[in-house]
Design a protein with these regions (language model features):
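Charged, amphipathic alpha-helical linker segments immediately N-terminal to NTP-binding catalytic cores
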Residues: 176-177, 181-230, 234
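Pre-ATPase regulatory/linker segments immediately N-terminal to the P-loop/RecA-like helicase/translocase core
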Residues: 137-187, 198-199
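Conserved lysine of the Walker
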Residues: 262
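Glycine-rich, often acidic-flanked micro-motifs
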Residues: 2-72, 236-257, 267-268, 273-275, ...
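C-terminal non-catalytic accessory extensions
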Residues: 522-542
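Gly-rich Lys/Arg/Thr-decorated short loops/hinges at beta-loop-alpha junctions or inter-strand turns
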Residues: 85-91, 198-203, 413-419
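N-terminal accessory targeting/assembly segments
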Residues: 2-161
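Short histidine-centered catalytic/ligand-binding loop motif
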Residues: 92-99, 205-211, 423
Length: 542
């Protein structure tokens, strides 16, 4: 499915796809101060010439195959104090309490006040299969060309080959995605930045925010919203397919915030014991009718905390954000990673990082795993009831990650709920709830919880999680009832046995489910209110 950029004149007057915000943003793209970027190589050159950008002595792997100059190098940009996404800056038009007229006024002023700047713009696609693909546009001041370059490499540049693919995709009655970004424009009263989203009209304006993740996830926010309207489930997680013997396969999706292990589990090769196909480690969609899955982006926006300079994965770097640089023994500028400079150092790695990559999985997904960091839960639980399975996704309990910018009063270690591990939802939560429940109730998808944090006082090591994952795929896990808690089963793991005989443990479980109950109860009467059955099923566990 492809979105639309042009219209017959007879379609324009009463077109519901236009709005105050969309018309303000799209109009800005046509100014005589905006220069279109027409190739990946041009974007690279502009980024390399941006003041402050560091050109490392680390070559890009297979540059020509990615549209880059043959001598292209890895580029570094550093943002300053902010090195993570700032959710508090988001304003969603259509949400209660949001004044569209006020935000439209801010948007028009932002465009006018920045008219003397030189701007650049580019196009990409989001969605890598002909069944779902949307064209996206980004404009940004030339002084921030590195953001545009990273954005182009994160998604897929709209070149001649992509145009042919796009033109052959099914057209849908939705407009292209438009994003206007001015990282230097500070709106009075919004010192941390302001990100205005009009998801119903596929557009956004990002003001005063330099972090690349705002632009990546801002684009995905609009694409996920669009996909939801077309009958897809938005997925912030990883998906891989195990291609087993006798023509069998096992497809699994893991959902979690940054730092939950979703990328690690997705890319794990299990010492070569399995033939594996990877869809993506962060962003995809599932069709609720045929259960096929589509990746939204070709590359990977990965943390650098576990990748010292000599790590083989660094061969596939394209750009780096918020990392250090030093000199090696041969006098070459190389990355100083592992979060020495600051937390949440990041990289865009090319699609060549995975030699087993696919953009579309037509086999039905077999299992969905909620990755949590809830110390009351054992390393793995199986959920046997569709209502409870979707409820536990809607009340996914975890810890905040370094990918987020938090205000000073926020405890980064506090247990929080992030429904379906997706903080980028713009539509009512109940839509996701019903979609996931349908997967579990009508489509035969199994549901599990994996605790990748602490169980009571013991850290669940990666090796334990991987062993459970392998046995899950092979069908050799032996589940037993989780005490008297209905529709929950667990696996006995040495060193992580639930102390059912200890009263305090049941009290902690009660508090954990009560925490979820209270969260859902507070949603009543608001945009994200969930069906009554969610509260009812949580009561059975309390």
């Amino acid at each position: 499915m492809s979105t639309r950029r042009v219209w017959k004149q007879s379609e324009i007057k009463t077109n519901p796809l236009f709005s105050k915000m969309r018309s303000t943003i799209e109009t800005a793209f046509y100014g005589n101060n905006v220069t279109p970027v027409t190739s990946v190589a041009q974007a690279y050159q502009l980024a390399a010439e941006e003041p402050g950008v560091i050109v490392l002595d680390m070559p890009v792997y297979k540059p020509c195959e990615q549209g880059l100059p043959a001598d292209a190098k890895v580029l570094v940009t550093n943002d300053g104090k902010t090195t993570g996404r700032y959710a508090k800056a988001r304003r969603i038009i259509g949400d209660e309490g949001i004044d569209e007229v006020e935000l439209a006024n801010i948007a028009r002023d932002a465009v006018y006040d920045s008219r003397n700047k030189e701007w650049i713009a580019a196009q990409t696609i989001v969605g890598l299969d002909k069944k779902f693909t949307a064209r996206a546009h980004l404009m940004i001041p030339k002084d921030h060309a590195s953001i545009l370059y990273s954005w182009i490499m994160n998604f897929k540049f709209f070149d001649a080959a992509v145009k042919e693919f796009y033109d052959d995709s099914l057209e849908i009655p939705e407009g292209d995605i438009y994003i206007y970004s001015d990282p230097d424009y500070i709106v009075p009263g919004h010192p941390g930045g302001l990100a205005i989203f009009d998801p119903a009209h596929n557009c956004a304006m990002i003001l005063g925010m330099r972090y690349f993740g705002e632009h990546k996830k801002g684009t995905l926010t609009l694409a996920w919203s669009l996909a939801n309207r077309l009958g897809y489930v938005a997925c912030h997680g990883g998906m891989k397919r195990y291609n087993l013997d006798n023509g069998k396969s096992y497809t699994i999706g893991v959902f979690g915030l940054s730092g939950s292990g979703k990328s690690t589990l997705t890319h794990e090769k299990h010492d070569g014991r399995y033939d594996i196909s990877i869809l993506h480690d962060d962003a995809y969609i599932i069709n609720t009718e045929d259960l096929s899955s589509i990746a939204l982006e070709p590359t990977y926006f990965d943390k650098m905390q576990d990748y010292p300079v000599e790590h083989p994965a660094n061969e596939f770097l394209l750009t780096l954000q918020n990392v250090g640089v030093t000199m090696d023994e041969d006098g070459r500028k190389v990355v100083l990673a592992e979060d020495v400079r600051n937390s949440n150092g990041r990289a865009i790695k090319s699609q060549f990082w995975t030699d087993n990559r696919v953009n579309y999985v037509d086999e039905p997904v077999n299992a969905i795993v909620w990755l949590m960091k809830d110390k009351t839960l054992p390393p793995i639980l199986k959920i046997d009831d569709p209502v409870l399975a979707s409820t536990m996704g809607a009340t996914l309990a975890t810890r905040r990650s370094t990918a987020e910018k938090l205000d000073a009063h926020v405890d980064p270690n506090a247990l929080v709920i992030e429904p379906y591990a997706n903080p980028f939802r713009t539509y009512p939560l109940a839509l996701d709830y019903e979609s996931y429940k349908k997967l579990f109730s009508e489509c035969g998808v199994e549901c599990y919880i994996m605790n990748t944090g602490f169980f009571l006082d013991n850290k669940v090591p990666k090796e334990v999680t991987l062993d459970l994952l392998e046995r899950l795929v092979e069908g050799t896990l032996e589940f037993k009832p989780f005490y008297k808690y209905p529709n929950l089963e667990y696996v006995e793991v040495p060193g992580f046995e639930p102390p059912f005989q200890v009263r305090e443990y049941h009290h902690q479980l009660h508090k954990a489910f009560e925490f979820r109950y209270d969260y859902v109860e507070k949603l009543i009467g608001h945009k994200n209110e969930l069906p009554e059955e969610v509260l009812e099923v949580l009561k059975t566990l309390m």
